[in-house]
From Swiss-Prot:
Gene3D superfamilies, sorted: Antioxidant, Horf6, Chain A, domain2, Glutaredoxin
InterPro entries assigned: AhpC/TSA, Peroxiredoxin, Peroxiredoxin_AhpC-typ, Peroxiredoxin_C, Peroxiredoxin_TDXH, PRX_1cys, Thioredoxin-like_sf, Thioredoxin_domain
Provenance organism: Pyrococcus horikoshii (strain ATCC 700860 / DSM 12428 / JCM 9974 / NBRC 100139 / OT-3)
Cellular component terms per the entry's GO annotation: cytosol
Protein's UniProt name: Peroxiredoxin
Function statement: Thiol-specific peroxidase that catalyzes the reduction of hydrogen peroxide and organic hydroperoxides to water and alcohols, respectively. Plays a role in cell protection against oxidative stress by detoxifying peroxides.
Amino acid sequence: MVVIGEKFPEVEVKTTHGVIKLPDYFTKQGKWFILFSHPADFTPVCTTEFYGMQKRVEEFRKLGVEPIGLSVDQVFSHIKWIEWIKDNLSVEIDFPVIADDRGELAEKLGMIPSGATITARAVFVVDDKGIIRAIVYYPAEVGRDWDEILRLVKALKISTEKGVALPHKWPNNELIGDKVIVPPASTIEEKKQREEAKAKGEIECYDWWFCYKKLE
């Protein structure tokens, strides 16, 4: 089982787009990726999730992020299900879906709940260096909110690029709106710097350890 901050394991996987190597397939293109598992093909909740992801896929791609699905079904099942979605819901799934029919990758990543034989609804956000930046789990009976995952990815990329933190419900936080949090001072000197920045109007603070500013 892996955790946030670790390197994504190097694996070769069979997908609806052919055999690919992770994380190299995406990182060598300078891209982040979202690996998400679903319990099974031809199931209602999973179908709504794939429909929802495809409807938002260009928003993820504008951020330099590619989705890739996974379940323990075989590749022919994925292909027929994708065809069904296209024929019946008028949406063409254009991202790869891993056929982890032996469950080896799912087991390695901790995607299979205790006592189960199919995956939970796991989400792994992996950056362009192959580092796992976020892991989210939903139970089989509850579908994911891709808008929240999109918010998570946007926030992670901003945090990485700007060295800031993002508050609850950003960019619609109840206290500071769409502003971002300046990391708390960790030394006396940094505390002085925060106070000086506040005096200059460069940042706002509730206290020296709780400062925020507009996103530049």
